[in-house]
């Protein structure tokens, strides 16, 4: 089990050039690159940036959107942990929030040779050590198709969907 103090997370947070920002209860880290200044500038308004982007998914618990700030395009996701059950939130008392966990896992996948969108920034809000909000910002993968579009274009999409479900279950277990 990874904790908020795991060496893998510390390595990601302390990469050369990564900038950390603390704004009230928001803890926010932006990796080095041409995106850094633009993504640092949106920290105080991150909720509005995501909500007003090109929304790809919106639910009570999360919003995912394609966004552009100062000519920098990115994918951003906001997970609202306050909409989740308390016991679910409690596990993140010692574990990193999903945004930081995603950054660490993406790094592992990239080193293993599995291309995954590069994490540009990650952040979370905590109240009394419990995650209330989690933010992940990645590069946009141009030309990527949604799973829905890909499945609908396949002649045996029912079987493909079933197999995809089995694979997803294995990945999440």
Which ranges hold each PLM region?
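Conserved ATP-binding subdomain of kinase catalytic cores across diverse folds
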Residues: 38-146, 155, 163-173
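Juxta-kinase regulatory segment immediately upstream of eukaryotic protein kinase catalytic domains
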Residues: 2-54
């Amino acid at each position: 089990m990874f904790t908020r103090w795991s060496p893998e997370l510390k390595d990601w947070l302390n990469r050369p050039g990564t900038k950390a920002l603390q704004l009230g209860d928001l803890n926010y880290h932006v990796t080095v690159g041409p995106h850094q200044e633009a993504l640092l500038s949106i920290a105080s308004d991150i909720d509005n940036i995501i909500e007003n982007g090109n929304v790809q998914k919106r639910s009570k618990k999360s919003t995912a959107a394609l966004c552009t700030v100062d000519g920098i395009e990115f994918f951003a996701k906001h997970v609202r942990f306050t909409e989740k059950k308390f016991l679910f939130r409690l596990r993140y008392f010692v574990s990193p929030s999903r945004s930081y966990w995603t950054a660490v896992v993406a790094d592992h996948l990239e080193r293993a040779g599995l291309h995954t969108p590069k994490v540009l920034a990650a952040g979370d809000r905590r109240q009394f050590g419990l995650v209330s909000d989690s933010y992940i910002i990645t590069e946009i993968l141009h030309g990527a198709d949604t799973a829905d579009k890909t499945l609908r274009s396949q002649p045996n999409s029912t079987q493909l969907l079933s197999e995809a479900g089995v694979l997803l279950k294995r990945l999440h277990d």
